[in-house]
């Protein structure tokens, strides 16, 4: 044991000294990029978690969670929120309360810091698993680039600053994808368990259950529904007021609020759009999403399962954020697996309109204008909505134009990718 520790210490010392020694040959581009990106990525993770996360913000998503688990421990009412104010509310079902109950046995600050730590760890594990899904390793340039890109986004930063659970949600989604791609009964059951744990807390990833149905991976549904069912059955007699969740909280969840809501209906109500126009917009974007999903299913499900699964997930989640009653900016965290498809040669994201859309729902830039406050508020409040909307337009247009070209060339039976893409199915090594 002692020899192993000495060897490890010597190895670390040697690596540190080698970083400052003159090179005997010109470093590769990948080596230079890794040297640049890793320090920035690591410090960005530390800054977002240790500095911004612990400093917190006026928006505190953890406060209601902590009050709920403390009330659960003490046997007090949990689902007694006053929904007539705009502060964060506790909306998790009894099963989610049971899952998070251990945080109620720590002092509030310690509990919050552990909550942040678990989410940071979940983000990092999810990043590693995404690299493996796309055949990259930690020694590639893609590793620090992905970590840096994730922790520079509004969605990850606000997840940690507001102390939300989206890091664990992302990890659940990535595990779900990884096991679905692996295939087999055991992997399908594990995929269902992974997404089922997220459904115990909130239903944000529920639209993804369409994917195993379309791919005939029905074992996934057993654990996807079984895990939240078991947690809620176990929690029901332990929660003092479980029916208040049904009578009081569920109607609020199903309603539409006109603040901190980037969905079409949320921003539409905020800006006073007529309901017929809101409905028309929702129908238009629903049709775009359905068209994209059909093209993906018809031409990619069997030819390119990875591309089909992850691109379809992006369409499903983006459409749900945009079309359902509530869409918040940090929900975009769950889109990282979809955005990683940019490394694939047939990605729908290799064009500038796609990255204009991504800027809209991922940027930390604030567009509030001191001299023109009305214009500034509009730009700030609508950038996420426009980003999600443009993304659905981009995906449909890319796939539809591929379809038209393939139909014109008479090669629909070979798929809709341009012929040159057939020679570049795998991402280039980085």
From Swiss-Prot:
Phenotype of null mutants: Cells lacking this gene result in colonies with a more erose appearance compared with the usual glossy appearance. The mutant yields arabinogalactan (AG) with a significant reduction in arabinofuranosyl (Araf) content concomitant with a relative increase in the amount of galactanfuranosyl (Galf). It shows only a slightly reduced growth rate.
Membrane topology value: Multi-pass membrane protein
Enzyme class at the top of the EC tree: transferase
Main location: membrane
Pfam families linked: GT87 (PF09594)
InterPro entries found in the cross-reference section: GT87
Subcellular compartments: Cell membrane
Top-level taxon of origin: Bacteria
BP-aspect Gene Ontology terms: capsule polysaccharide biosynthetic process; cell wall organization
Record-listed E.C. numbers: 2.4.2.47
Membrane spanning stretches: 26-46, 114-134, 136-156, 160-180, 194-214, 218-238, 276-296, 307-327, 352-372, 381-401
GO molecular function: hexosyltransferase activity
Biological or metabolic pathway of the protein: Cell wall biogenesis; cell wall polysaccharide biosynthesis
Assigned keywords, A-Z: Cell membrane, Cell wall biogenesis/degradation, Glycosyltransferase, Membrane, Transferase, Transmembrane, Transmembrane helix
Catalytic activity: Adds an alpha-D-arabinofuranosyl group from trans,octacis-decaprenylphospho-beta-D-arabinofuranose at the 3-O-position of an alpha-(1->5)-arabinofuranan chain attached to a beta-(1->5)-galactofuranan chain
Role description: Involved in the biosynthesis of the arabinogalactan (AG) region of the mycolylarabinogalactan-peptidoglycan (mAGP) complex, an essential component of the mycobacterial cell wall. Catalyzes the addition of an arabinofuranosyl (Araf) residue from the sugar donor beta-D-arabinofuranosyl-1-monophosphoryldecaprenol (DPA) on the C-3 of an alpha-(1->5)-linked Araf from the arabinan backbone of AG.
Family (UniProt): Belongs to the glycosyltransferase 87 family.
Name this protein carries in UniProt: Alpha-(1->3)-arabinofuranosyltransferase
Species name: Mycolicibacterium smegmatis (strain ATCC 700084 / mc(2)155) (Mycobacterium smegmatis)
């Amino acid at each position: 044991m002692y020899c192993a520790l000495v060897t490890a210490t010597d190895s670390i010392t040697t690596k540190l000294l080698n970083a400052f020694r003159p090179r005997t040959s010109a470093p590769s581009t990948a080596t230079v990029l890794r040297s640049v990106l890793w320090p920035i990525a690591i410090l960005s993770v530390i800054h977002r978690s240790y500095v911004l996360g612990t400093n917190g913000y006026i928006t505190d998503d953890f406060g209601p969670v902590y009050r709920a688990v403390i009330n659960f421990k003490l046997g007090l009412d949990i689902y007694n929120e006053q929904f007539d104010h705009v502060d964060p509310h506790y909306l998790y079902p009894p099963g989610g309360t049971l899952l998070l109950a251990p945080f109620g046995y720590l002092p509030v600050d310690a509990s919050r810091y552990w909550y942040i730590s678990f989410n940071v760890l979940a983000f990092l594990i999810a990043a590693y698993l995404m690299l493996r899904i796309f055949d990259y390793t930690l020694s590639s340039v893609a590793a620090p680039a992905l970590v840096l890109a994730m922790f520079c986004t509004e969605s990850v930063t606000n997840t940690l600053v507001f102390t939300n659970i989206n890091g664990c949600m992302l990890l659940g989604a990535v595990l779900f994808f990884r096991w679905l791609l692996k295939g087999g009964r055991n992997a399908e059951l594990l995929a269902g368990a992974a997404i089922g744990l997220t459904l115990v807390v909130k239903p944000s990833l529920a639209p993804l259950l369409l994917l195993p149905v379309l791919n005939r991976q029905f074992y996934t549904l057993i654990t996807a529904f079984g895990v939240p069912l078991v947690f809620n059955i176990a929690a029901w007699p332990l929660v003092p007021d479980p029916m208040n969740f049904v009578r009081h909280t569920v109607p609020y969840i199903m309603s539409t609020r006109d603040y901190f809501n980037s969905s079409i209906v949320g921003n539409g109500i905020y800006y006073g759009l007529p309901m017929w126009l809101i409905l028309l917009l929702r129908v238009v974007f629903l049709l775009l999403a359905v068209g994209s999903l059909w093209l993906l299913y018809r031409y990619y499900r069997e030819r390119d399962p990875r591309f089909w699964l992850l691109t379809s997930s992006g369409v499903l989640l983006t459409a749900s954020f945009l079309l359902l009653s509530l869409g918040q900016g940090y929900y975009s965290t769950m889109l990282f697996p979809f955005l990683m498809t940019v490394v694939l040669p047939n990605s729908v994201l290799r064009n500038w309109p796609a990255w204009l859309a991504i800027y809209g729902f991922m940027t930390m830039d604030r567009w509030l204008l001191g001299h023109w406050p009305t214009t500034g508020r509009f730009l700030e409040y609508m950038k996420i909505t426009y980003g999600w909307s443009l993304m659905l337009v981009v995906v449909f247009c890319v796939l539809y134009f591929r379809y038209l070209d393939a139909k014109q060339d008479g090669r629909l039976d070979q798929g809709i990718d341009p012929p040159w893409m057939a020679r570049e199915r795998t991402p280039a090594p980085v």
